[in-house]
A protein has these predicted regions:
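N-terminal beta1-alpha1-beta2 submodule of the flavodoxin-like/Rossmannoid cofactor-binding fold
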Residues: 1-124, 197-201, 219-225
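A short, gly/pro- and small-residue-rich
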Residues: 122-134
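Mobile beta-alpha loop/short-helix "lid" or hinge segments that flank ligand
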Residues: 56-78, 131, 165-186
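Short, glycine-/small-residue-rich phosphate/pyrophosphate-handling segment
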Residues: 138-180, 195-198
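A general structural signal for alpha-helical elements within enzymatic catalytic domains
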Residues: 38-45, 130, 163, 212
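Proline-centered loop/turn at the N-terminus of a beta-strand
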Residues: 7, 137-138
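Glycine-rich phosphate/pyrophosphate-binding loop and the adjoining helix
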Residues: 3-4, 48, 168-225
């Protein structure tokens, strides 16, 4: 029996940080993001003769685009993508983020739905980096919404976006509706019997299977085309 630690990068999709006029959390996604991080940190899954765990890095647009953040100089407007710089000339924070993405084995995207699509902060953050950093690695999609639809239209929009980057998405989705009724701000669960919670393990099982399969193929073939 052996163990394998997957380097897992989580991209948070929304940069919105203001309470709506009708009240509630200033950032609806904080709870589900914290929960996903906790679940990844404690996860130990059996896959064949391997025990799979996760080493997690989170990229949040509130941090990434903030003053001093990895992409602060370029900004959410995507003025200077990483792949436009010559080797060694990208800002240090951007280069460090690029190397983390390059070293990742798989990705999870946790995002809200904006106008039946994905948030601009997410497409800008991930789009700062070329497909060579994402390719031949799987991704999992987790969406959320205060509505009954669970951000499912963002999930649909994400599939071609992730495919173009090269990090093909697992078929299973995690779409969490009425998300404020499921999670507290700190990621604790309000009702452990909520059946929506069962979505995440299904997504992770597929992402882990794909990640290990792709890693083994790269090891066998000595690289990717």
């Amino acid at each position: 029996m052996t163990s394998r630690v997957l380097k897992t990068v989580v991209f948070m999709g929304s940069a919105r940080d203001i309470s709506p006029p009708w009240g509630g959390s200033s950032r609806l996604g904080n709870g589900i993001l914290a929960w996903v991080k906790t679940e990844l940190a404690k996860r130990s899954a059996q896959l064949g003769d391997e025990t799979i765990t996760h080493e997690v890095t989170v990229f949040d647009p509130l941090d990434v685009f903030a003053p001093g953040g990895a992409l602060a100089e370029s900004g959410a407007e995507l003025k200077t993508p990483h792949f436009f710089f010559k080797a060694g000339e990208a800002p240090a924070g951007m280069e460090a983020m690029a190397q983390t993405i390059k070293a990742a084995d798989c990705f999870l995207i946790v995002t809200a739905e904006y106008n039946h699509s994905l948030p601009p902060a997410l497409s800008s953050m991930m789009g700062h980096f070329g497909g060579s950093l994402y390719k031949f690695k799987p991704s999992g999609i987790i969406t959320y919404s205060p509505s009954p639809y669970g951000g499912s239209r963002a999930a649909v929009a994400l599939r071609p976006f992730l495919s173009e980057l090269g990090c093909l998405s697992a078929s299973k989705l995690g779409c969490f509706s009425m998300v404020g009724d499921i999670f507290n701000e700190d990621g604790s669960v309000k009702d452990e019997s909520n059946r929506q919670l069962k979505q995440l393990p299904g997504v992770l099982e597929q992402v882990e299977w794909l990640a290990v399969a792709m890693l083994k193929q790269k090891e066998a073939c000595g690289g990717c085309p």
